[in-house]
Amino acid sequence: MSTPEQEVEYRQHRFSPPPGATEIFLVRHGESAPAKGDNPFELVDGQADPDLAPEGRDHAERVGRRLADERISALYVTTLRRTPQTAAPLAAKLGLTPEVEPDLREIHLGEWENGLFRRYTYEGHPIVEQLWREQRWDVIPGAETMESFGGRIRAAIGRLAAANPDRRIAVFTHGGVIGEVFAQASAAKNRFAFLGADNGSISHLVVSGENWMVRRFNDTSHLQSPFG
């Protein structure tokens, strides 16, 4: 007597990176020191280079604990010291020396470097309103053009992906950079749609050739921050 053939089950697909793809955890640096008019930041190639604030060092420790078991093969930082300072706890846990990727440094804010962007944002400067209305950093006098910024970010991500096929890497970078990466990945019409990643947050991108896939944005669960 024949038995009924077992019914085939078709489960929902679970994502896995394509062969040769690179998983990139983009970590925004921890909170940096506050800007003070009578104590300007040091500059590196014309860009403000503040240390981490005490809160930022706590962010760095929490990031290190969160990512310590994520099979990360390489770490990258920028030329601005708040990124290697944020990477330091994870680097110590993994026994890895971070490599410097200069092109993932923050957008250059021209005449508004050295804390002036923070001040003018707080004061409600009319150019800040124009910046958000037009979705362009280069309305700020002397700022890097959007074309230059977007081009160097895309080139840098492409280089890191090409150097790390089938690997996971962590990139310690800046809020403007993360916003630009995810705007490009999603082809967002609003260029600032992903601006505002929190200090110490982790975002996750998968790069397979020219295809950039968004996996998560602004994960702060390790920071124990409520929604807000």
Residue ranges of each PLM-predicted region?
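Short beta-strand scaffold positions
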Residues: 77-78, 151, 172-173
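Acidic, low-complexity terminal tails and accessory targeting/binding regions
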Residues: 1-23, 66, 99, 107-119, ...
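Generic structural signal for well-ordered alpha-helical scaffold segments
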Residues: 61-68, 150, 154-162, 182
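Phosphate-handling substructures
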Residues: 50-51, 94-154, 215-218, 227-228
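Active-site-proximal alpha-helix that buttresses catalytic centers in soluble enzyme cores
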Residues: 2-25, 31-100
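Active-site signature of alpha/beta-hydrolase-fold catalytic machinery across serine-
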Residues: 89, 180-184
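Glycine-rich phosphate-binding loops at beta-strand->alpha-helix junctions
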Residues: 82, 177-180
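Active-site metal-binding loops of divalent metal-dependent hydrolases
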Residues: 30, 175
